Amino acid sequence: MSRCSFVFVTAKNADIKLINRFLLTIRDWEYGEDDTWDCFTLVTSKTEPLPLDAESTKPPLQELPPNEWEGSSLEEVEAAVLARGKEEDSAYGKQQGPNNLSLFLVLDDKSVEDRTVILCQRAIDWDAEPLTYPEGFNKFRTPWTSAYLDWCNLDISNIGWSEMCDWEDADEGKNERDGVWWTYGNHVEELTSEENRKKRDAVIKELEGLGQA
């Protein structure tokens, strides 16, 4: 099973069409294949433990389960992820399953308006010996079209968190151990090739015709 991360939808006006469009946009169109290009698990239950061994969610969804996270705050999501991590550490000594608790996405009301999504990563103190992970998450907003690549680069440690942010402006003086909001610093255009963008847009357009996106 491939490694994946959770998606929480807290937006109050996110219907199944928007969620399908979002999940298709954050698919790995550049390098993925049918069984590997979806890397995110949609979480709708607030009462059940976060499913660390759940398969990734594969759009299009035909129906949306009752979403208990609707209207929740980002702080509630962070608290749930931290609590799940503590449960796993206590039971096994380390987190089990492919689902990555150190990275997750949150689709909130602003995400519906401007087609961004909140990308969160567990805070880390690089100066501590050994490394420590403060109970908080660094976060920034990234466009839907950049979310997969940003997530992937962080997941495989190809790019550090601070490298993605704008140190010359609002983030000056911040540290990755802080667990605070950062300013997205990737000012390049979407990196998905034109060929694969056409494939993606064609799938979304087809689903629009079917009333599913």
Language-model segments: residues:
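Extended, charge-biased low-complexity segments
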Residues: 1-142, 206-213
